[in-house]
């Protein structure tokens, strides 16, 4: 930020950028021109949701992660039937969120791995909505990640990347952030 030192700098700045009245007038003029040049479009509604799925784990052990709680012989007695029920319950809630228009984009937290998302999007009632997904592979010790599922006919994924959270002293690694760029399709 520079400080203006004299009237000459002030007048040069106003010539270069215009004063506030000029900028407002140009902005309004551009808005009016753009409004006339763009044909009227109907309002298109889409829904966005974010959900902590609270330990969406499969029933297999990942030797690189601490997922022992969610195995068939572990303390939670996590088995295939409970896993399938959880997938079904999540699918039911997702479709209910949108009433007749299920969410176009859904951010999911606490997803274990790249196995549970195909089970959720392709082997559950969500398969009819043609959801696709992108997810992180975080250094979290329990193996939980974040993901975005999206309806392919409503959203075009352009790019995605994981953003690591710095680990501070006396803290353990945690889930990465998921940064996604895309286009809403009309």
Indicate residue ranges for each PLM-predicted region:
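Short regulatory "switch" loops immediately downstream of catalytic or recognition motifs
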Residues: 1, 58, 97, 183-185
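Bacterial Sec-dependent N-terminal signal peptides
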Residues: 1-43
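Context-gated lysine
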Residues: 5-7, 16, 65, 84-86, ...
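Compositionally biased, intrinsically disordered low-complexity regions enriched in proline and serine
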Residues: 10, 15-18, 69, 81, ...
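Short charge-dense sequence patches
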Residues: 18, 42-45, 66-72, 162, ...
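N-terminal, active-site-proximal structural segment of metallo-dependent hydrolase catalytic domains
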Residues: 38-130, 134-144
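Structured beta-strand-rich core segments of catalytic domains in phosphoester-bond hydrolases
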Residues: 111-186
């Amino acid at each position: 930020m520079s400080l203006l030192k004299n009237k000459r700098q002030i007048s040069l700045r106003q010539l270069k950028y215009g004063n506030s009245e000029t900028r407002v007038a140009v902005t309004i003029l551009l808005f009016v021109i753009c409004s006339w040049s763009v044909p009227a479009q109907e309002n298109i509604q889409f829904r966005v949701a974010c959900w902590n799925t609270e330990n969406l784990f499969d029933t297999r052990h990942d030797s690189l992660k601490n997922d022992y709680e969610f195995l068939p012989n572990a303390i939670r007695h996590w088995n295939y039937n409970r896993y399938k029920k959880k997938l079904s319950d999540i699918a039911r809630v997702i479709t209910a969120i949108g009433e007749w228009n299920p969410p176009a984009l859904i951010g999911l937290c606490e997803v274990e791995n790249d196995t549970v998302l195909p089970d959720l999007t392709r082997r559950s009632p969500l398969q009819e909505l043609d959801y696709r997904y992108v997810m992180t592979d975080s250094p979290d010790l329990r193996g939980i990640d974040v993901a975005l599922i999206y309806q392919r006919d409503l959203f075009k994924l352009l790019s995605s990347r994981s953003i690591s959270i710095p680990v501070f002293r006396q803290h353990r690694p945690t889930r990465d952030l998921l940064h996604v760029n895309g286009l809403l399709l009309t």
